[in-house]
Amino acid sequence: MIYQMQMPERIEVDEATHSESIGQFVAQPLERGYGVTLGNAMRRVLLASLPGTAITGIKIDGVFHEFSTIDGVREDVPEIVLNLKKVRFKSTTKRSCKTSLSIEGPADFKAGDIVAQEGEFEVLNKDMHIATLNGDAKLNIDIYIGRGRGYVPAEENRGEGMPIGFIAIDSIFTPIKNVKFSVENTRVGQRTDYEKMILDVETDGSISPDDSISLAGKVINEHVSLFANFSPTEEEFAEEEYKQQDDEFENMRKLLQTRIEDLDLSVRSHNCLRLAEIDTLGDLVSRKEDELLTYKNFGKKSLTELKEQLDKCELKFGMDITKYQMKS
């Protein structure tokens, strides 16, 4: 009897704690060991492989490197950069964009002041503090926003064609703020050695917890399906086919080179073929039946005997053996 693996029929959702950004999901029952297997895979993909939107760089008038200070602004450039990394976006497009701001003091520069020029994005944490400007301060800043996955260091955001004074920053694209899982024992009938995997997900609000686990599951499935549907590539098929054809060709060539005296034939048939200068199977199969019957002392009984021998070798009279470079 084939053992049927225990699998969950559906994913359970904890409705009591569910919200637009927080979700708890339960998968049960699972075979022992599968709680950690699935939990680890989901956690890694959720944190590193989901697409999101983040700031990739900035340009501030009068600032030419990231270790500068700005007159009339309490925070220095490194502090401003750290604050901008924390700004979370919900994007309406997959393309990169730039927005320009001009802020005059006194002012408290917040994430909500970052406005899309063509509605490409929405800032989610609008109250996030960016910088404090004194009464005579003025801040002109270009903010570059892009799409990506996981975490991308500043070095990778330094693309060609950027203006002088462009400051690339680390981008945290992942829309997942936190994800953890735990594994507990669960009962199925009289057995208590099955597992229950509990997955807790918190997003930044740009994607729902439900959509995030669905997308993560699809990413995993796309990779696992490569193994489930594994078969040799077309090139491997072609190579194997050519090899098989080469082997068949060589085997046939050797068979056609078989000497007539090595066949289990009567003395009469041997003598008839020898007198007709038919020395190999290749010589024999290149002849037609009518031609053989014209040879001296060669009758229908001998023809039947030869047919039986050729049938055993899967050969027949009247074959074209020129491609095997056989002497007919």
From Swiss-Prot:
User: Could you confirm whether the keyword Cytoplasm appears in this record?
Assistant: no
| GO-annotated cellular components | cytoplasm; DNA-directed RNA polymerase complex
GO annotation, biological process: DNA-templated transcription
Q: Which InterPro entries match?
A: DNA-dir_RNA_pol_insert, DNA-dir_RNA_pol_RpoA/D/Rpb3, DNA-dir_RpoA, RBP11-like, RNAP_asu_C, RNApol_insert_sf
UniProt key word Nucleotidyltransferase: yes
- Entry superkingdom: Bacteria
Task: Name the EC number(s).
Answer: 2.7.7.6
Q: What are the entry keywords?
A: DNA-directed RNA polymerase, Nucleotidyltransferase, Transcription, Transferase
Reactions catalysed according to its record: RNA(n) + a ribonucleoside 5'-triphosphate = RNA(n+1) + diphosphate
GO MF term list: DNA binding; DNA-directed RNA polymerase activity; protein dimerization activity
What's a Pfam family in this record? RNA_pol_A_bac
Where does the record place the region Alpha N-terminal domain (alpha-NTD)? 1-231
Q: Where is this region: Alpha C-terminal domain (alpha-CTD)?
A: 252-328
UniProt enzyme class: transferase
**What CDD domains does the annotation carry?**
RNAP_alpha_NTD (cd06928)
What family is this protein classified in?
A: Belongs to the RNA polymerase alpha chain family.
Checking NCBIfam families in the record gives: PRK05182.1-2 (NF003513), PRK05182.2-2 (NF003516), PRK05182.2-5 (NF003519), rpoA (TIGR02027)
Please give the subunit comment from the record.
Homodimer. The RNAP catalytic core consists of 2 alpha, 1 beta, 1 beta' and 1 omega subunit. When a sigma factor is associated with the core the holoenzyme is formed, which can initiate transcription.
Q: What HAMAP family does the record tag this protein with?
A: RNApol_bact_RpoA (MF_00059)
Q: What is the annotated role of this protein in its UniProt record?
A: DNA-dependent RNA polymerase catalyzes the transcription of DNA into RNA using the four ribonucleoside triphosphates as substrates.
- Domain comment quoted from the record: The N-terminal domain is essential for RNAP assembly and basal transcription, whereas the C-terminal domain is involved in interaction with transcriptional regulators and with upstream promoter elements.
Give the protein's recorded name: DNA-directed RNA polymerase subunit alpha
Species name for this entry? Prosthecochloris aestuarii (strain DSM 271 / SK 413)
**Gene for this protein?**
rpoA
